[in-house]
From Swiss-Prot:
PANTHER family: CYTOSOL AMINOPEPTIDASE (PTHR11963:SF23), LEUCINE AMINOPEPTIDASE-RELATED (PTHR11963). It catalyses: Release of an N-terminal amino acid, Xaa-|-Yaa-, in which Xaa is preferably Leu, but may be other amino acids including Pro although not Arg or Lys, and Yaa may be Pro. Amino acid amides and methyl esters are also readily hydrolyzed, but rates on arylamides are exceedingly low; Release of an N-terminal amino acid, preferentially leucine, but not glutamic or aspartic acids. Binds 2 manganese ions per subunit. Its cofactor is Mn(2+). This is Probable cytosol aminopeptidase. It comes from the Bacteria. It comes from Methylobacillus flagellatus (strain ATCC 51484 / DSM 6875 / VKM B-1610 / KT). CDD domains: Peptidase_M17.
Length: 496
């Protein structure tokens, strides 16, 4: 989709469609009022019929409105004028984009960014238009032999602002929205790929391509390098697969040379059968999404590179498959991690923490200001929080607050769960320093407790995205979360 910013009167726009907002109680937005005057009260007559009530997300598509150059006018409900908030605004945008999906290769002008939203500026309103337009029209059809029958929808979207003086702010919002949308789409594409395509080697190739196109530094460590580092926990997960593991290290170095980096660690299990502790067959196909932590790190790097954030950021992605095989790790095996701590593997399906713990130890060499790991780690987190909020754990209150604030700002929310010492005893083992599981009770918490044992030398947070990284059912597909949260967090760290 091609985006642009413009100020000007909506009635003169020679477009396939002009989108304007209406409020409840038959009240016009400023742009809608201009169209009503140009049409000599035509829109007012439409509102009086009650065909659209102005409630958030309601729409009405009109054709050949008198006095308006555009072929169509889409009215979009915004709710009560004095109560227009972020939620209602975003709902209206989604409804508008959905209503226009029947158009074919359309050139559209949207005048919703002109409407005041509580505590939000022009740049934010414009960025939301771009992000929601791209998200709502995203399709993954790489493996379709024939293109889906249907219209192409919107080809060009011109975002209108009220005054010429607003154009610069609008352009800023356009850049931010496009960068974030690109990062989210990249993460979605990686998540949606079939696991016979998206292997650890493929992820490494994508990281290298991203580095080449966006001026990043990248290093891909092979199995031999991982062995030399003493990452016995990571290697224990890889033993059942013919796909070679990779440790991908990305660097965005745009901060001061003396600035310590923020480190993002992404779980990259490109397919998870559960290993010897084999998962049930039902819905196992969705275990291709077990690399969405890695995908979100790559997507975030794409976004911050396009934003040219003045910050030093390191991405660490341990990636492999978890497969059953004659060589695979067995329940009862003891692994020695890079930190020297030993782990009794009671369940090979609790493998994400086994690759992450070595990556967290590896992160120490960068002397980070903070480390955030991202992982589709536990089904227990889905039971606790459902599919709306990611689980957040941290050993530093101020870091947790930053991430919570970033999630609220980006509408990619998280909820903090406890990391109390009381839970640590559930990981006790008779045969090693710890077990890799702590029983059914508090499963997401004990998983975070496990990781915390490898993150004692820096400020650390863990995002469990098992409930938010993808959708099942009719809308099955990767969501791209938490790229918005992570990008906003890094923007705030960079002072942007």
């Amino acid at each position: 989709m091609e985006f642009s910013i413009k100020s000007g009167t909506p009635e003169k726009q020679r477009k396939d469609c002009v989108v304007v907002g209406v409020f409840e109680a038959r009240k016009f937005s400023d742009a809608a009022a201009v169209l009503d005057r140009a049409s000599q009260g035509y829109l007012g007559d439409i509102l009086r019929t009650g065909d659209i009530d102005g409630k958030p997300g309601s729409t009405l598509l009109l054709h050949s409105v008198p006095g308006v150059a555009a072929g169509r006018v889409l009215l979009v409900g915004l709710g009560k004028e004095r109560e227009l908030d972020e939620h209602s605004y975003r709902k209206a945008l989604r409804a508008a984009i959905k209503a226009l999906h029947t158009l074919d290769d359309a050139d559209v002008a949207i005048c919703l960014a002109e409407v005041p939203v509580k505590k939000r500026d022009t740049a934010w309103r414009v960025a939301q238009v771009v992000e929601i337009a791209e998200d709502s029209t995203y399709r993954f059809d790489r493996f379709k032999s024939k293109p889906a029958n249907g219209k192409k929808g919107i080809a060009k979207l011109q975002v209108h602002v009220t005054r010429r003086s607003d154009v610069a702010e609008g352009e800023k919002g356009l850049r931010q929205g496009k960068a974030l949308a690109a990062g989210v789409s990249f993460a979605k594409d990686l998540g949606n790929l079939a696991p016979n395509y998206c292997t650890p080697s493929y992820l490494a190739e994508q990281a290298e391509a991203l580095s080449d196109s966006h001026g990043l530094q990248v290093e891909v460590l092979e199995k031999e390098d991982i062995e030399k580092l003493g990452m016995g926990s990571f290697l224990g997960v890889t033993k059942g697969s013919v796909q070679p593991p990779k440790l991908i290290v990305l660097q965005h170095r745009k901060g001061k040379k003396s600035q310590k980096p923020v480190v993002l660690v992404g779980k990259g299990i490109t397919f998870d059968t559960g290993g010897i502790s084999l998962k049930p067959g039902a819905d196992m196909d969705e275990m291709k999404y077990d690399m969405c932590g890695a995908a979100s790190v790559l997507g975030t790097f794409k976004a911050i590179a396009e934003l040219d954030l003045p910050l030093n950021v390191v991405g660490i992605i341990p990636t492999c498959e978890n497969m059953p095989d004659g060589n695979a790790t067995r329940p009862g095996d003891v692994l020695t991690s890079m930190s020297g701590q030993t782990i009794e593997v009671l369940n090979t399906d609790a493998e994400g923490r086994l690759i992450l713990c070595d990556a967290l130890t590896y992160a120490e060499r960068f002397e980070p200001q903070a480390v955030v790991d991202v992982a589709t780690l536990t089904g227990a987190c889905v039971i606790a929080l459902g599919h709306h909020a990611s689980g957040l754990f941290s050993n530093k209150d101020s870091l947790a607050e930053e991430l919570l604030d970033a999630g609220n700002e980006a509408y990619d929310r998280a909820w903090r769960l406890p990391l109390w010492d009381d839970y640590q005893s559930q990981l006790d083992s008779n045969f090693a320093d710890m077990a890799n599981i702590g029983g059914r009770a508090g499963g997401s918490i004990t998983a975070a407790c496990f990781l915390s044992r490898f993150a004692k030398k820096y400020d650390w947070a863990h995002l469990d995205i098992a409930g938010t990284a993808w959708k099942s059912g009719k809308e099955k597909g990767a969501t791209g979360r938490p790229v918005p949260l992570l990008t906003e967090f890094l923007k705030q760290r960079a002072g942007k």
